[in-house]
């Protein structure tokens, strides 16, 4: 067989012309070790801090430690299939989660993936989980209220839109109950809610979701769940993912409320991740930047001005301010608020609601300690009618608790002291409230008005709550115009005051109290 040189050259030319030279330039590295969800990766010279890394099996990780000859990364999800020598690729993207109204009514994990079995979420947008908080110029002062529906909070420690109000207390003192009641009370008030569950039992999270569904609150709520069975990295990042979902509404001129339940477990998860990454431990074995962990998260809750919203939406939304209100929860050990994480978060937030085990066990629920609980900016946002009527309530309660402690040892008390103790008992009883029964502004106003004007003085302590319920029913059926006026205007005018007094006196005559 004789080969023709021209045929050979033609064959070679055709092969060369058909050669596909498609090449993907990716920064890659090799897994050196895998332990407890932490991977050490050699290579990845151009990786960014916080960048998503792609592991085999469609698994992603997060680059946290950038060292001279290796990268320390946390794996987001299962890591059992990752082994030494596996190839790791850079993605060139910071960790993002889906955002938007498509998430409302759904339960998602830290990465925004649905875990409620209701099918995929067709979110149109995604956003990075780590963002810089709005600057000083972009912010506006807190001046609009967030009604929690809880008498003791709305009267003594009011919360405003854009505020950070800490809920702090030992385990089993009703911290989650306060936050869930606040979410339920936002129905019809135009506030979107995000509930972030960190390190809780899956059964506990399921109970909260079921209660929100029963009260129709899931229509305007997103639940971000990082259960106790999830990895430490997922628990640590859940709060930031939830915050990004809440910021979507804030930046578009809407109002949102976010509950972090709870940041103690987030700090534990971050401590675990940091120690596994071999970062040097500090006080209570927490890393040096544990304050920054919470401050950069809570500073993102703010009320932003009209100009910020207009610039963000490129003029699509004008004349509207946006807000993200945060209710972080901290669990204390044996009432120790001077521990590392509680003191950090107290110093970052705009006030705290302190829940006490002794009060809870005594049947005073919500178990709010009126002496230590404070709202630093909420007073400006409180509704006028409640502000005018609740002035003396907090002082009365604080003085009553002090006097009650002394009265245990004193046998003969003067009339003034006895009167103050009696009033304190009645106010304490009045501020008790069952779970999942939030009150409207007019109900709170009527109760406070009755207490301030001595209508409860002749009512037995055990009859205070039945008296209150009867009064509300009486006002709703016979004085609907007055009730609607107070609810709409949020003011008790000089004309309405005698009308309310007459209505309560009318009820006293007809009721057997």
Curated annotation (Swiss-Prot):
Protein's UniProt keywords contain Translocase: yes
Gene3D superfamilies with a match to the protein in the record: 2.40.30.20, ATP synthase alpha/beta chain, C-terminal domain (1.20.150.20), P-loop containing nucleotide triphosphate hydrolases (3.40.50.300)
Predominant subcellular localization, coarse grouping: membrane
EC number: 7.1.2.2
Binding site for ATP: 169-176
GO cellular component: plasma membrane; proton-transporting ATP synthase complex
Keyword list, A-Z: ATP synthesis, ATP-binding, Cell inner membrane, Cell membrane, CF(1), Hydrogen ion transport, Ion transport, Membrane, Nucleotide-binding, Translocase, Transport
Assembly behavior: F-type ATPases have 2 components, CF(1) - the catalytic core - and CF(0) - the membrane proton channel. CF(1) has five subunits: alpha(3), beta(3), gamma(1), delta(1), epsilon(1). CF(0) has three main subunits: a(1), b(2) and c(9-12). The alpha and beta chains form an alternating ring which encloses part of the gamma chain. CF(1) is attached to CF(0) by a central stalk formed by the gamma and epsilon chains, while a peripheral stalk is formed by the delta and b chains.
The family this protein is said to belong to: Belongs to the ATPase alpha/beta chains family.
Role this protein plays: Produces ATP from ADP in the presence of a proton gradient across the membrane. The alpha chain is a regulatory subunit.
Protein name stated in the entry: ATP synthase subunit alpha
Protein's organism: Cupriavidus pinatubonensis (strain JMP 134 / LMG 1197)
